[in-house]
Swiss-Prot record:
GO terms for biological process: positive regulation of canonical Wnt signaling pathway. Belongs to the tigger transposable element derived protein family. It comes from Mus musculus. Residues 38-58, 110-142 bind DNA. This is Jerky protein. InterPro entries: CenT-Element_Derived (IPR050863), DDE_SF_endonuclease_dom (IPR004875), Homeodomain-like_sf (IPR009057), HTH_CenpB_DNA-bd_dom (IPR006600), HTH_Psq (IPR007889). Brain; highest in the temporal and brainstem regions.
């Protein structure tokens, strides 16, 4: 009887109200995904079934806060996700804070309070609000900001936060059943596409060009396997460059912006009108269901809109915390380096480059370099963030090494030695680093023409052989002019598709590469040869270029 009364009494007692921290709530969500018993979780955390259902319903908000939080300590202290009274002001202020942090500008507590007051006046709000120290503390706790001062705003790489974000990302991918085909990353890079390296000596012997400062910003995006590469988006200053007139198809997308940079409007338009349709088309191509989900991984930038704005049905975005971007952003793990390596080594003649190279050529070069990055580069770039995923090996390691490795040409030491042992000319006054810079840039040429020292000088070719060489060279020049005219003509005809134009431009690239194998690519070598002939007429230079002037008295001394 007594036991029944005790049981009835215990049953009638109300359970003490327990408010879990955000970290505990995220742990519950993770354990529910693993299939752990709800009853066991209720007993461990001393909560009811309705509480578990509420936590599960707010899982997306919890994970979003976790991803954007700068400090894991905020998860251990904060217990609710209540919104502030002035929600719009809070959102605008936090967005401003993220912009300044991404720019590397320190933001202190007083600065944040003054900016909040400024936004309050600009929005013409009437609801009373006191921007005090308590308000600042609540703002920091609400957004997971650990500390505010001039010394702590510069974000250093946080390895512990990187490990935690990797765990969050893996759980997110497992929850939605995502494969590497469904996970994308995007990032921007700037290109000063008309600028040349300063490799020639500044002694007045070489005609100088005014260095071009024409800049493009390129937005690159691809999935984790590298099998689907979104058409790059180039942003320039001009709305309709003269080089685009009459061209029906561009190999990449192009937008104009005053500073040649990505802004929120351009990025949002790219997301909804280029990225999302391209992803869905790719899913149809590989046989995935139309309702398959896709994730776009971004870093915090003033150019990117909020996560809530970058959503389209089954396609959504997540942001890397600022403190782990340098450690986990796939673009920083070799993709950007491989792209830039391919971009700065195009099969374009060095002579006449600044004046003949226009923005259309640069865009074609961007498309060529982006498509030439080996798929294995993309796959390896995700190893830090997603180490548990397995990829189907695509390109060989040799292909990746050829693309990414920056090594001096194998004949660099030999060439440099001959230059410095030769007659007194510009080559003897060059620094090793400047010569190596151009040798590395011309590394795609199989064998560089040897510069022969006076002791190795050879006799010039006979007049008949020279005439034959000049005739053959003229034929190559005529073919090059005709080929370029054909490409320009096809660009202005609507009957050619983008794929057909790409094939024609690829063939044009092969032709130009073969043409360059017949002549020195590096302008420095031409300068050395010309000066050697001018200062020492008895020296002849052995080269594959048949039209180089040469003294008929060479070797008669």
């Amino acid at each position: 009887m007594a036991s029944k009364q005790a049981a009835a009494k215990g049953k009638g007692e109300k359970r003490k109200r327990v408010v879990l921290t955000l970290k505990e709530k995220i742990d519950i969500c993770t354990r529910l995904e693993r299939g752990e018993s709800r009853k066991a979780l209720m007993q461990e955390y001393n909560v009811g079934m309705s509480t578990l259902y509420d936590i599960k319903a707010h899982k997306a908000q919890l994970l979003r806060f976790f991803a954007s939080s700068d400090s894991r300590q905020a998860l251990e202290q904060r217990r609710t996700l209540h919104t502030p009274k002035l929600e719009h002001l809070d959102r605008v202020l936090y967005e401003w804070f993220l912009v300044k942090r991404a720019e590397g500008i320190p933001v202190s507590g007083p600065m944040l309070i003054e900016k909040a007051k400024d936004f309050y006046k600009q929005m013409r709000l009437t609801e009373p609000c006191v921007f005090s120290g308590g308000w600042l503390w609540r703002f920091k706790a609400r957004h997971g900001i650990k500390k505010l001062d001039a010394s702590s705003e510069k974000q250093a790489a946080d390895h512990q936060a990187a490990e935690q974000f990797c765990g969050f990302f893996r759980s997110l991918a497992a929850e939605h059943g995502l494969s590497p085909e469904q996970v994308y990353s995007a990032d921007e890079t700037g290109l000063v596409w008309r600028c040349l390296p300063n490799s020639a000596p500044d002694d007045g012997t070489v005609p100088h060009f005014k260095q071009g400062k024409d800049r493009l910003t390129v937005l690159m995006c691809a999935n984790a396997t590298g099998s689907h590469r979104i058409k790059p988006l180039a942003i320039g200053k001009g709305g309709g460059p003269r080089a685009f007139r009459g061209i029906q198809h561009l190999p990449i997308a192009y937008k104009a912006q005053g500073n040649a940079w990505v802004d929120k409007e351009i990025f949002s338009d790219w997301f909804h009108h280029i990225f999302v349709p391209s992803v869905r088309e790719h899913f149809r191509t590989i046989g995935l269901p139309e309702d398959s989900k896709a994730i776009l991984l971004l870093d915090h930038s003033r150019a990117h809109s909020q996560e809530s704005e970058l959503v389209s049905e089954n396609v959504f975005t997540i942001f890397l915390p600022s403190s782990v971007t340098s450690l986990l952003q796939p673009t920083e793990q070799g993709i950007r380096r491989a792209f830039m390596r391919l971009f700065i080594n195009p099969p374009v003649a060095f002579q006449g480059f600044p004046t003949r190279h226009n923005i259309n050529d640069a865009i074609v070069n961007v498309a060529r370099a982006w498509n030439a990055v080996p798929s294995q580069v993309f796959q390896r770039a995700w190893r830090k963030l997603w180490p548990t995923v397995t990829f189907t090996e695509g390109s060989s390691s040799e292909e990746e090494a050829e693309c990414c490795a920056i090594k001096p040409h194998k004949t660099f030491a030999h060439i440099l030695g001959l230059v410095k042992e030769g007659p007194t000319c510009s080559g003897s006054r060059l620094q090793d680093s400047r010569v190596e810079e151009r040798v590395v840039a011309g590394r795609d040429i199989d064998e560089a023409p040897a510069i022969v020292a006076p002791s190795q000088a050879t006799r010039c070719t006979k007049k008949s052989e020279k005439d034959t060489g000049e005739t053959e060279e003229a034929a190559w020049e005529q073919a090059a002019t005709s080929f370029e005219a054909l490409v320009r003509f096809a660009e202005r005809q609507p009957c050619f598709s983008v794929q057909e134009m790409g094939q024609l431009q690829a063939l044009h690239t092969v032709f130009r590469r073969q043409q360059q194998l017949r002549q020195p690519r590096v302008a420095l070598r031409a300068v050395i040869k010309l000066e050697a002939l001018q200062e020492h007429p008895g020296v002849c230079v052995a080269t594959t270029h048949p039209t180089l002037p040469c003294s008929s008295t060479a070797g008669d001394n």
